[in-house]
Amino acid sequence: MSDITRRNFVNGTLMAAGASVLPMVGTGQAVMAALTPSYYPPTRTGLRGSHPGSNEHAHARAWGGQSNSGAPTALNEEYDLVVVGGGISGLAAAYFYQQEYGTDKKVLILDNHDDFGGHAKRNEHNIDGDIRIGFGGSESLEGKRDYDEVMLNLLKDIGVDLELFSEAYDVDFYKRHNLGASTYFNKRIFGEDKVVKHPFCGYPAFIEGLLRSKLPMEKAVEQTPLSKKGKEQLMRVLKGGEHVIDIPKEDLKEYIHTHSYFDYLTNTLGVDDPLVLRMARHTSIDYTEGGTDTLSIAEVLESGPLGIDPSISWKNAIGDGSDQKYLRKEGDTFSLKDPYIHHFPDGNATIARLLVKKMIPNVGSGTNAQEIILSKFNYDELDKPSNNVRIRLNSTVVNVVHDGPPHNASGVYINYINNNKTYQIKAKGVVMACYNMIIPHIVPDLPQDQYVALRSLNKVPLQLSTIGVRNWRGMKELGIGMVMCPGNMHQAVNLDFPVSIGDYEYTKSPDDPCILHMRSAPLGETIGAPAIEQFKEVRYRMLGLTFDDYEQEIREHLSGMLPKELFNFDRDVQSIMVNRWAHGYSYGDPGDIGRQPFGRITIANSDANDTSLVQSAIGQAYRAVKEQM
């Protein structure tokens, strides 16, 4: 067992044994670290996200064709509503149901994971007695200017003040520490380990306050380990734009929507260097649904591709769209009207926790976002029989069927598997807030057109690894706030967002512990293969890797990138959480047919609206609850 695996075991599994002797340094994080946890998933290290044990029963049905989960044990439990899926949409559905029909209504939420929140995954790293909080999925509250009344009322009711981020987010942090965006070329792919202080793309621009590169593009290209031919071709891409396309100006807008980005690279610009194409393919990461080899020019331009600002190089093609009206072109602030600062330390897990706290008051302390950020939830409270809302984790729903003809049924039977045993409960209604693509496999009598619509959906695989490190001196030395990594599994690495809320304080000095976020939207091996084929390939590959595989990749990545005199993996890395989401972003729209009610069963989840934003998850939950009438 490697050192990091031993540390993971000690920190993740045996924390309770050592909690009483952790050093106290007077911070809110230290007080929290000293609390003895029992069942507390946020501190679990190793493979997280869709962790081992969370998807096996669902995959047996969807991939293996298994339809018989054994005779269920009938429990003497009947609810007004059962919610399948404990992500933000499922939690919001339970919340809205009580708001609509009374807080005395009995609701049970079933989820296949060992924690609630779905993609809104809280990661807590205990680094020498100091709790560092990170996010393992759903990242921020985006598009605030477009929130509807339902969303705003929910946020207000659970204790979220959107104005607090203007002070909580330390936009001057990067300037104070001289941190910007760079690119890391690794030895395994590019022939040598080298960091160039230029991102060559617009992806890092979403991080408010991150310094823009002052290194001229020509000098940056010259510093890369590319061949002479590769450097010439990279420069051609960076200086490209609408001016190289020989068509009338008025036809440009249609052109970029109907022509492939990779066709533009290879045929229009004549790029054939595999390393330049690799850089181009890996720039969008989680901005888009798949790699840039599967997208149109217009889709890629939205993701900050290789090259200068698209609002300059593709000005006539993209026009003066809504985004261009609020982007700031100068300085280090990306957006004026809706800056990307609405981020809790644990991402949108704070929203999930506030919803749980609202419905199960005894789960922990705090009544708003500031107070709850360091609250150590008592998971023993989640499924108490005395609760009007109960959350049952590690429970995979495998069958949902009406007790009679759907149009006049009086209830719904729900079968689920917990600890390899099948149980049955009953409810007056069910909200399916799970991945919509699994619904046809567990609701057996769906109408054919609805079955087909839901089966057509897919998911974009994503991965977000959080690394607890004792210091970030190496990042400081290289001036890295975010670094693009086109040769690695994780395509970008960044310091956690500089947010301090309540008694939680963000790292102040490079000598302090912090979390490194390593991002990945893995791609298939074949350039240009259809996106869905690539998703499937990546999904199997992702789930086939062990923690040792991920640890070795992370070890090689960080050790090759950071200065050896300032970073030693075994000494400085305290903990690793690999949040694998083999089923990540929504892909495909089920339409009205797919999301329509079916008897006493209604459908929520952001999948129902073909978007992965939290406001969509909440909006679809609201609709699904209204349809329960």
Protein language model annotation of sequence segments:
Residues 39, 67-255:
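N-terminal glycine-rich phosphate/pyrophosphate-binding loop and immediately adjacent elements
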Residues 2-81, 99-104:
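Extreme N-terminal leader/targeting segments of oxidoreductases
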Residues 134-145, 247-254, 337-346, 451-456, ...:
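Active-site rim elements
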Residues 34-70, 124, 188-189, 193-194, ...:
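Conserved flavin/dinucleotide-binding core of flavoenzymes
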Residues 93-95, 118-125, 441-445, 478-479, ...:
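Short, solvent-exposed loop/turn and secondary-structure capping segments
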Residues 385, 389, 393-517, 526:
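Mid-domain catalytic core of redox enzymes
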Residues 225-395, 405-409:
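Active-site/ligand-binding neighborhood in enzyme catalytic cores
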Residues 80-92, 111-113, 397, 429-436, ...:
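Conserved beta-strand->loop/alpha-helix structural units within folded catalytic cores of enzymes
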